[in-house]
Amino acid sequence: MADQSTRPIAIFTAGTAASGKSTALRSTEWAGLPVVDPDRFKPLHPEYDPRAPELVHEWSKVEASKLRRKYLTDGVTHVVDGTGAKAASFCARIEEARAAGFSIKVLWVQCDLRVALKRNAARERSVKPEVVRGQAKTIPFTMAIATDIVDEVRVVDTNPKQTFEEWLYQNTDTNEY
């Protein structure tokens, strides 16, 4: 196998919708790399509605998969944008890249569920809150598995910086007392 420093790299993102994956990626040395992202294909579909992106998600995943496979075939270092919510498909894509001779890295972007839900609600292109909640439950399981099959996992916390008092105020439901 080629020296890891000379092998192409596949960087996989993981984190809930609205966790800040794109923002976190821009702050790394991987900023500017080609990104395989189903969301970038969605606006190209004639029936795309930013308020219901799930309607064209399967189509956009197929298009993104074609591009990802081209990068693997051509040996292009790239980023695969995703949530990591489905362990089987996340790990299968990792294994596919590994089999193609790539070094594998994961950028795991973490934020509190309340933060992700608030960011998601503020977006034009949002996903259903129950989807974000489901992702928050399954991503840690996926990462527990993926950690054993990748070369590096980088964790980035995108929670807003705040004082303890601010956090307590935002995370306490006064109706509970």
PLM segments and residue spans:
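Conserved GTP-binding G-domain of TRAFAC-class P-loop NTPases and closely related GTPase folds
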Residues: 4-11, 19, 30, 114-177
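Conserved beta-strand scaffold positions in the cores of enzyme catalytic domains, especially
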Residues: 33-35, 106, 153-155
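Acidic, metal-coordinating catalytic cores used for nucleic-acid/nucleotide bond scission
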Residues: 81-90, 113
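P-loop (Walker A) phosphate-binding loop of NTP-binding proteins
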Residues: 16
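Conserved substrate/cofactor phosphate-moiety recognition/catalytic segment
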Residues: 22-78, 88
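Short, electropositive alpha-helical surface patch
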Residues: 86-103
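Short catalytic-loop micro-motif centered on adjacent basic/acidic residues
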Residues: 78-83, 106
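Conserved phosphate-donor/acceptor-positioning beta-strand/loop module used by diverse small-molecule
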Residues: 98-119
